[in-house]
Design a protein with these regions (language model features):
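Substrate-binding clefts and catalytic carboxylate motifs of secreted carbohydrate-active enzymes
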Residues: 243-256
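Alpha-helical solenoid repeat scaffolds of the TPR/TPR-like class and their adjacent stem/linker regions
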Residues: 1-238, 249, 259, 288-295, ...
Length: 443
């Protein structure tokens, strides 16, 4: 809600309670408050212990399956128009069907969208189980003799960790939807990369770390961008002023970041801050905070939802620079901006959720847009906003790199994540316990 009146007090209370292993905040909510990986682990473990106090008997009986193809199942409540689904769709379509059989299990709503239809078609089998209890879903996976179960939810809304607590598959992985540890002993691996998940973070993860090359985050290189873009005037933006943009959800906007943005507005005459349409309470809180910083609240412009994702991507053309958040970076939203050709400035954080921007920018050959401190972040944004030739050179480099660097090479990513699956599968087939590993570059 962007209500920061008690932020300092709440931060102290939350840290104290989490340290004492009291479940007063969800692990997902904590990521927006706290960058300490040690506290994130404690919170996740406490939450998981409260959610599943007694572990059910494992359904997988230790059998070593000998299928012609490795059977992978992706589980999610978000197989619809959703930030997790957009980047996943192309990967599901590209999976090598000579080596993998790909199943989908959806425990979320059917929104009737084109994205939902596309996702269903991308699976070899698709099971809608929203009304089925957790143990029944787990039994379904065991009956299908799934080799690898991939959770795309973690601790996000509508997650169902109890399915995995039943141990329906010999290999259970956490990927994409939740940038942190589940704190669950029944999850074997978490998929990241060397930037978001260096091996020195292993002590803060209950899962073993899998490092992909380039970037852990998949992106769909076929997403269309509307040819027609609304005008700045239609979007409520100034025709000639500098447009700072951040389309992150409100829970990612912290007071320190917002105050940096207000200082930038104060220094760049005629500039505006373009945000996603938030709930009315968050909008009013941000307007009040702007006034407290001496900024006319009318310089905050809120973008409504668009009819299509292609239209949303197209309107990025109206902005000059995307401003990332901390301690929880833009994830899919950052990918949207870069795919649409909008440069992004990030500040590298202490833990997984705050390092995603750095990972994305490195994978598209723009490490110069990664700041190592908030002071450096502010100075870099100011330079870009006041030096048109510098900004233009960055925009040209982004356009050149967009289709030539790894970030948007979905098939390259597919080869990497399949190599990760096969490595985990081989470890299991040899009767070894899960271990952390790094995937080599695809040929």
């Amino acid at each position: 809600m962007c209500d920061w009146t008690r932020t300092a007090e709440l931060d102290r209370e939350i840290e104290a309670h989490v340290t004492e292993r009291k479940s007063i905040i969800t692990p997902f909510t904590l990521l927006g408050y706290c960058s300490k990986a040690s506290l994130q682990l404690k919170c996740a473990r406490s939450w998981m212990q409260d959610a599943i106090p007694v572990r059910p008997q494992p359904l997988w009986n230790g059998a070593i399956y000998q299928h012609e193809r490795v059977r992978i199942v992706y589980l999610s409540a978000d197989f619809r128009r959703h930030a997790t689904a957009y980047p996943m769709a192309r990967l599901l379509e590209l999976h090598d069907r000579t080596r993998f059989e790909v199943l989908g299990v959806s425990f979320g709503v059917d929104d009737g969208s084109d994205m939902r239809s596309r996702l269903i078609k991308s699976f070899d089998q698709f099971h809608a189980v929203r009304l089925e209890p957790d143990h029944a879903v787990a039994k379904l996976l065991t009956a299908r003799e799934v080799d690898i179960a991939v959770d795309l939810m973690g601790h996000t809304q509508d997650a169902r960790p109890d399915i995995f607590a039943h141990r329906p598959a010999p290999i259970q992985m956490s990927y994409l939807g939740y940038p942190g540890t589940t704190g669950a002993e029944f999850m074997d691996y978490v998929i990241g990369d060397a930037i978001v998940l260096p091996f020195d973070q292993q002590e803060f993860f209950s899962e073993k770390i899998v490092q992909l090359p380039d970037c852990f985050m998949v992106n769909d290189s076929t997403r269309p961008i509307s040819a027609q873009t609304i005008s700045r005037a239609q979007a409520g933006l100034p025709e000639h002023g500098f447009v700072f943009c951040c389309f992150n959800q409100s829970y990612k906007i912290s007071r320190p970041m917002f105050r940096i943005w207000m200082r930038l507005l104060a220094r760049i005459e005629g500039s505006v801050l373009w945000l996603s349409q938030l709930n009315s309470r968050a909008v009013q809180n941000l307007r009040n905070e702007a006034m407290a910083c001496g900024i006319d609240p009318e310089r905050l412009v809120f973008a409504p939802w668009t009819a299509t994702q292609a239209d949303h991507l197209a309107r990025h053309r109206l902005a000059d620079l995307f401003l990332d958040t901390l301690p929880y970076n833009a994830h899919t939203t950052a990918g949207d901006a870069l795919w649409a050709g909008l440069p992004l400035v990030t500040c590298r954080g202490e833990s997984f959720p705050g390092r995603v921007g750095a990972s994305l920018l490195n994978a598209i050959g723009l490490p110069e847009l990664v700041a190592s401190s908030l002071d450096e972040y502010e100075a870099l944004i100011l330079k870009l906003a006041t030096d048109p030739s510098f900004l233009q050179s960055i925009r040209r480099k982004l356009e050149q790199n967009r289709l030539s660097y790894p970030l948007f090479d979905t098939d390259r990513f597919r080869r990497h994540i399949e190599a990760a699956y096969l490595t985990a599968w081989d470890i299991w087939q040899r009767g070894e316990t899960p271990r952390s590993f790094r995937v080599g570059l695809a040929r």
